[in-house]
Amino acid sequence: MSNQNSKKHLGHTARKRFGQNFLHDMNVIHNIVSAINPKNGQFLFEIGPGLGALTEPVAEQVDKLTVVELDRDLAERLRHHPFLNHKLTIIEQDALRFNFREYFESLELKEGEGVRVFGNLPYNISTPLMFHLFKFHDLIQDMHFMLQKEVVKRLCAAPNSKAYGRLTIMAQYYCQVVPVLEVPPTAFKPAPKVDSAVVRLMPHKVLPHPVKDVYWLNRVTTQAFNQRRKTLRNALSTLFSPEQLEALNIDLNARAENLSIADYARLANWLYDNPPAVDNQEEIIDEDI
Protein backbone atom coordinates (compact mmCIF):
# COMPACT_ATOMS: atom_id res chain seq x y z
CA MET A 1 0.00 0.00 0.00
CA SER A 2 1.38 3.41 -0.93
CA ASN A 3 2.06 5.95 1.79
CA GLN A 4 -0.63 8.20 0.29
CA ASN A 5 -3.25 5.43 0.41
CA SER A 6 -2.33 4.60 4.00
CA LYS A 7 -3.32 8.17 4.91
CA LYS A 8 -6.63 8.03 3.07
CA HIS A 9 -9.88 7.11 4.84
CA LEU A 10 -13.41 7.36 3.45
CA GLY A 11 -12.09 9.36 0.51
CA HIS A 12 -10.30 11.96 2.63
CA THR A 13 -6.51 12.20 2.87
CA ALA A 14 -5.32 12.96 6.40
CA ARG A 15 -3.54 16.30 6.67
CA LYS A 16 -0.41 16.23 8.77
CA ARG A 17 -0.58 19.95 9.58
CA PHE A 18 -3.94 19.34 11.27
CA GLY A 19 -2.65 16.28 13.14
CA GLN A 20 -5.37 14.11 11.60
CA ASN A 21 -5.69 10.43 12.57
CA PHE A 22 -9.16 9.04 11.93
CA LEU A 23 -10.74 6.61 14.37
CA HIS A 24 -12.31 3.59 12.66
CA ASP A 25 -12.40 0.72 15.20
CA MET A 26 -16.10 0.18 15.95
CA ASN A 27 -15.50 -1.45 19.34
CA VAL A 28 -13.42 1.51 20.49
CA ILE A 29 -16.01 3.95 19.12
CA HIS A 30 -18.79 2.10 20.98
CA ASN A 31 -16.83 2.20 24.24
CA ILE A 32 -16.13 5.93 23.92
CA VAL A 33 -19.75 6.79 23.17
CA SER A 34 -20.85 4.61 26.10
CA ALA A 35 -18.46 6.54 28.35
CA ILE A 36 -19.86 9.86 27.12
CA ASN A 37 -23.43 8.55 27.53
CA PRO A 38 -25.11 11.40 25.60
CA LYS A 39 -28.72 12.25 26.47
CA ASN A 40 -31.33 14.31 24.69
CA GLY A 41 -31.63 17.80 26.10
CA GLN A 42 -27.94 18.04 26.96
CA PHE A 43 -25.66 20.60 25.32
CA LEU A 44 -23.09 18.53 23.43
CA PHE A 45 -20.05 20.06 21.73
CA GLU A 46 -17.51 18.10 19.69
CA ILE A 47 -14.03 19.37 18.86
CA GLY A 48 -12.61 18.05 15.59
CA PRO A 49 -15.38 15.75 14.32
CA GLY A 50 -13.26 14.71 11.34
CA LEU A 51 -15.08 12.05 9.33
CA GLY A 52 -17.77 11.63 11.97
CA ALA A 53 -16.58 8.49 13.80
CA LEU A 54 -17.91 9.85 17.10
CA THR A 55 -20.27 12.42 15.61
CA GLU A 56 -22.58 9.87 14.01
CA PRO A 57 -23.20 7.57 17.01
CA VAL A 58 -23.54 10.52 19.40
CA ALA A 59 -25.95 12.35 17.07
CA GLU A 60 -28.05 9.20 16.76
CA GLN A 61 -28.86 9.56 20.45
CA VAL A 62 -29.61 13.30 20.56
CA ASP A 63 -31.54 15.91 18.58
CA LYS A 64 -28.75 18.46 18.27
CA LEU A 65 -24.98 18.61 18.39
CA THR A 66 -22.51 21.45 17.84
CA VAL A 67 -19.13 20.73 16.26
CA VAL A 68 -16.08 22.89 15.60
CA GLU A 69 -13.91 21.85 12.64
CA LEU A 70 -10.93 23.68 11.14
CA ASP A 71 -10.62 21.58 7.97
CA ARG A 72 -12.98 23.17 5.44
CA ASP A 73 -13.30 19.95 3.41
CA LEU A 74 -14.43 17.99 6.46
CA ALA A 75 -16.82 20.76 7.51
CA GLU A 76 -18.34 20.69 4.02
CA ARG A 77 -18.78 16.90 4.20
CA LEU A 78 -20.69 17.28 7.45
CA ARG A 79 -22.94 19.96 5.95
CA HIS A 80 -24.00 17.44 3.31
CA HIS A 81 -24.20 14.42 5.58
CA PRO A 82 -27.25 12.36 4.54
CA PHE A 83 -28.85 12.09 7.97
CA LEU A 84 -26.86 14.32 10.37
CA ASN A 85 -26.89 17.71 8.69
CA HIS A 86 -30.22 18.81 10.21
CA LYS A 87 -28.95 17.98 13.72
CA LEU A 88 -25.59 19.71 13.45
CA THR A 89 -24.46 23.23 14.14
CA ILE A 90 -21.10 23.43 12.36
CA ILE A 91 -18.54 26.03 13.39
CA GLU A 92 -15.69 26.23 10.89
CA GLN A 93 -12.94 27.64 13.07
CA ASP A 94 -9.74 26.88 14.96
CA ALA A 95 -10.74 25.57 18.40
CA LEU A 96 -7.60 27.13 19.91
CA ARG A 97 -8.89 30.58 18.97
CA PHE A 98 -12.58 29.94 19.48
CA ASN A 99 -14.38 32.02 22.13
CA PHE A 100 -16.00 29.16 24.01
CA ARG A 101 -17.30 31.48 26.74
CA GLU A 102 -19.23 33.66 24.32
CA TYR A 103 -20.76 30.62 22.63
CA PHE A 104 -21.53 28.66 25.80
CA GLU A 105 -23.12 31.70 27.45
CA SER A 106 -25.32 32.17 24.37
CA LEU A 107 -26.88 28.77 25.13
CA GLU A 108 -28.57 30.26 28.21
CA LEU A 109 -27.67 27.33 30.43
CA LYS A 110 -29.87 26.79 33.46
CA GLU A 111 -28.38 26.65 36.93
CA GLY A 112 -26.56 23.36 37.36
CA GLU A 113 -26.31 22.75 33.61
CA GLY A 114 -23.05 22.65 31.70
CA VAL A 115 -21.82 21.91 28.22
CA ARG A 116 -20.54 18.38 27.54
CA VAL A 117 -17.39 18.60 25.42
CA PHE A 118 -15.77 15.67 23.64
CA GLY A 119 -13.40 14.91 20.80
CA ASN A 120 -10.53 12.98 19.30
CA LEU A 121 -8.08 15.85 19.71
CA PRO A 122 -5.17 16.41 17.31
CA TYR A 123 -2.19 15.40 19.43
CA ASN A 124 -0.10 18.36 18.26
CA ILE A 125 -2.49 20.84 19.92
CA SER A 126 -4.09 18.79 22.70
CA THR A 127 -2.23 20.37 25.63
CA PRO A 128 -2.70 24.05 24.64
CA LEU A 129 -6.32 23.27 23.76
CA MET A 130 -6.99 21.84 27.22
CA PHE A 131 -5.37 24.89 28.83
CA HIS A 132 -7.68 27.03 26.67
CA LEU A 133 -10.74 25.05 27.77
CA PHE A 134 -9.84 25.23 31.46
CA LYS A 135 -10.62 28.97 31.26
CA PHE A 136 -14.27 28.05 30.73
CA HIS A 137 -14.50 25.36 33.41
CA ASP A 138 -17.46 27.06 35.08
CA LEU A 139 -19.60 26.46 31.96
CA ILE A 140 -18.57 22.85 31.32
CA GLN A 141 -20.17 19.73 32.81
CA ASP A 142 -17.52 17.30 31.60
CA MET A 143 -15.00 16.61 28.83
CA HIS A 144 -14.10 13.31 27.17
CA PHE A 145 -10.96 13.41 25.04
CA MET A 146 -8.89 10.95 23.06
CA LEU A 147 -5.27 11.89 23.74
CA GLN A 148 -1.79 10.49 23.53
CA LYS A 149 -1.48 7.87 26.28
CA GLU A 150 1.51 9.66 27.82
CA VAL A 151 -0.55 12.85 28.12
CA VAL A 152 -3.31 10.97 29.94
CA LYS A 153 -0.69 9.58 32.33
CA ARG A 154 0.46 13.11 33.06
CA LEU A 155 -3.10 14.34 33.57
CA CYS A 156 -3.74 11.58 36.12
CA ALA A 157 -0.34 11.64 37.84
CA ALA A 158 0.27 11.98 41.56
CA PRO A 159 3.09 13.90 43.29
CA ASN A 160 6.51 12.23 43.53
CA SER A 161 6.29 10.72 40.05
CA LYS A 162 8.03 11.53 36.76
CA ALA A 163 4.70 12.07 35.00
CA TYR A 164 3.66 14.74 37.52
CA GLY A 165 4.09 18.22 36.09
CA ARG A 166 2.51 21.55 35.28
CA LEU A 167 -0.17 19.91 33.12
CA THR A 168 -1.10 17.63 36.05
CA ILE A 169 -1.46 20.53 38.44
CA MET A 170 -3.47 22.77 36.14
CA ALA A 171 -5.79 19.94 35.06
CA GLN A 172 -6.41 18.72 38.61
CA TYR A 173 -6.75 22.28 39.90
CA TYR A 174 -9.79 22.67 37.65
CA CYS A 175 -11.05 19.09 37.23
CA GLN A 176 -11.41 15.62 38.59
CA VAL A 177 -9.45 13.46 36.13
CA VAL A 178 -10.45 9.86 35.37
CA PRO A 179 -8.76 7.56 32.81
CA VAL A 180 -11.41 5.74 30.75
CA LEU A 181 -9.75 3.35 28.28
CA GLU A 182 -6.58 2.73 26.31
CA VAL A 183 -6.61 2.66 22.50
CA PRO A 184 -4.00 0.99 20.23
CA PRO A 185 -2.60 2.67 17.09
CA THR A 186 -4.46 0.15 14.91
CA ALA A 187 -7.76 1.82 15.84
CA PHE A 188 -6.80 4.78 13.63
CA LYS A 189 -6.06 5.49 10.00
CA PRO A 190 -3.35 6.49 9.47
CA ALA A 191 -2.04 4.72 12.59
CA PRO A 192 -0.20 7.12 14.91
CA LYS A 193 3.24 6.17 16.20
CA VAL A 194 2.05 6.31 19.81
CA ASP A 195 -0.57 4.63 21.98
CA SER A 196 -3.69 6.60 22.81
CA ALA A 197 -6.13 6.78 25.70
CA VAL A 198 -9.46 8.38 26.56
CA VAL A 199 -9.78 10.56 29.64
CA ARG A 200 -12.75 12.11 31.44
CA LEU A 201 -12.31 15.60 32.92
CA MET A 202 -15.05 16.78 35.29
CA PRO A 203 -14.70 20.42 36.38
CA HIS A 204 -15.00 20.91 40.13
CA LYS A 205 -18.20 22.64 41.21
CA VAL A 206 -16.13 24.28 43.94
CA LEU A 207 -12.37 24.53 43.43
CA PRO A 208 -10.68 22.51 46.23
CA HIS A 209 -7.59 24.75 46.33
CA PRO A 210 -8.67 28.16 45.00
CA VAL A 211 -6.09 30.77 44.12
CA LYS A 212 -6.59 34.52 44.09
CA ASP A 213 -5.22 34.82 40.55
CA VAL A 214 -4.49 31.79 38.37
CA TYR A 215 -1.67 33.76 36.72
CA TRP A 216 0.47 33.15 39.80
CA LEU A 217 -0.32 29.44 39.83
CA ASN A 218 0.81 29.27 36.21
CA ARG A 219 3.82 31.38 37.06
CA VAL A 220 5.14 29.36 39.99
CA THR A 221 4.50 25.97 38.39
CA THR A 222 6.18 27.07 35.17
CA GLN A 223 9.32 28.15 37.00
CA ALA A 224 9.40 25.10 39.26
CA PHE A 225 8.96 22.52 36.48
CA ASN A 226 11.21 24.26 33.99
CA GLN A 227 13.97 23.48 36.50
CA ARG A 228 12.52 20.30 37.97
CA ARG A 229 15.94 18.74 38.69
CA LYS A 230 16.84 21.63 40.99
CA THR A 231 15.77 21.93 44.59
CA LEU A 232 13.02 24.47 45.14
CA ARG A 233 15.45 26.65 47.09
CA ASN A 234 17.27 27.19 43.76
CA ALA A 235 14.45 26.78 41.24
CA LEU A 236 12.27 29.42 42.91
CA SER A 237 15.07 31.71 44.11
CA THR A 238 13.88 34.66 41.99
CA LEU A 239 10.41 34.46 43.56
CA PHE A 240 11.03 33.43 47.18
CA SER A 241 13.81 33.66 49.73
CA PRO A 242 14.65 30.46 51.65
CA GLU A 243 13.06 31.99 54.74
CA GLN A 244 9.83 32.73 52.86
CA LEU A 245 9.63 29.16 51.57
CA GLU A 246 10.18 27.77 55.05
CA ALA A 247 7.49 30.08 56.43
CA LEU A 248 5.13 28.60 53.82
CA ASN A 249 6.02 25.10 55.07
CA ILE A 250 7.98 24.20 51.92
CA ASP A 251 10.98 21.87 52.24
CA LEU A 252 13.93 23.71 50.72
CA ASN A 253 15.41 20.45 49.45
CA ALA A 254 12.20 19.31 47.78
CA ARG A 255 11.86 19.34 44.00
CA ALA A 256 8.96 20.45 41.83
CA GLU A 257 7.30 17.01 41.67
CA ASN A 258 7.27 16.69 45.48
CA LEU A 259 4.72 19.46 46.08
CA SER A 260 0.97 18.94 46.10
CA ILE A 261 -1.57 21.15 44.36
CA ALA A 262 -2.40 22.64 47.77
CA ASP A 263 1.29 23.56 48.20
CA TYR A 264 1.39 25.30 44.82
CA ALA A 265 -1.87 27.12 45.57
CA ARG A 266 -0.35 28.38 48.82
CA LEU A 267 2.72 29.64 46.94
CA ALA A 268 0.54 31.29 44.28
CA ASN A 269 -1.57 33.12 46.85
CA TRP A 270 1.54 34.36 48.64
CA LEU A 271 2.88 35.71 45.32
CA TYR A 272 -0.43 37.44 44.67
CA ASP A 273 -0.08 39.25 48.00
CA ASN A 274 3.68 39.80 47.61
CA PRO A 275 4.46 40.10 43.88
CA PRO A 276 8.15 40.34 42.95
CA ALA A 277 9.34 43.82 41.99
CA VAL A 278 10.45 42.48 38.60
CA ASP A 279 8.59 39.49 37.18
CA ASN A 280 10.60 37.94 34.37
CA GLN A 281 8.09 35.35 33.16
CA GLU A 282 9.97 32.25 32.06
CA GLU A 283 9.23 30.56 28.76
CA ILE A 284 7.05 27.47 29.13
CA ILE A 285 8.82 24.31 28.00
CA ASP A 286 6.31 21.92 26.44
CA GLU A 287 7.91 18.76 27.78
CA ASP A 288 7.32 19.94 31.33
CA ILE A 289 3.69 20.99 31.05
Curated annotation (Swiss-Prot):
GO terms for molecular function: 16S rRNA (adenine(1518)-N(6)/adenine(1519)-N(6))-dimethyltransferase activity; RNA binding. It is an enzyme of class 2 (transferase). GO terms for cellular component: cytosol. PROSITE patterns: RRNA_A_DIMETH, SAM_RNA_A_N6_MT. It catalyses: adenosine(1518)/adenosine(1519) in 16S rRNA + 4 S-adenosyl-L-methionine = N(6)-dimethyladenosine(1518)/N(6)-dimethyladenosine(1519) in 16S rRNA + 4 S-adenosyl-L-homocysteine + 4 H(+). SUPFAM superfamilies: S-adenosyl-L-methionine-dependent methyltransferases. InterPro entries: KsgA/Erm, rRNA_Ade_diMease-like_C, rRNA_Ade_Mease_Trfase_CS, rRNA_Ade_methylase_Trfase_N, rRNA_adenine_dimethylase, SAM-dependent_MTases_sf. Keywords: Cytoplasm, Methyltransferase, RNA-binding, rRNA processing, S-adenosyl-L-methionine, Transferase. It is found in: Cytoplasm. Its EC number is 2.1.1.182. The keyword RNA-binding applies. It holds the Pfam family RrnaAD. S-adenosyl-L-methionine binds at N21, L23, G48, E69, D94, N120. Specifically dimethylates two adjacent adenosines (A1518 and A1519) in the loop of a conserved hairpin near the 3'-end of 16S rRNA in the 30S particle. May play a critical role in biogenesis of 30S subunits. Belongs to the class I-like SAM-binding methyltransferase superfamily. rRNA adenine N(6)-methyltransferase family. RsmA subfamily. This is Ribosomal RNA small subunit methyltransferase A. The gene is rsmA.
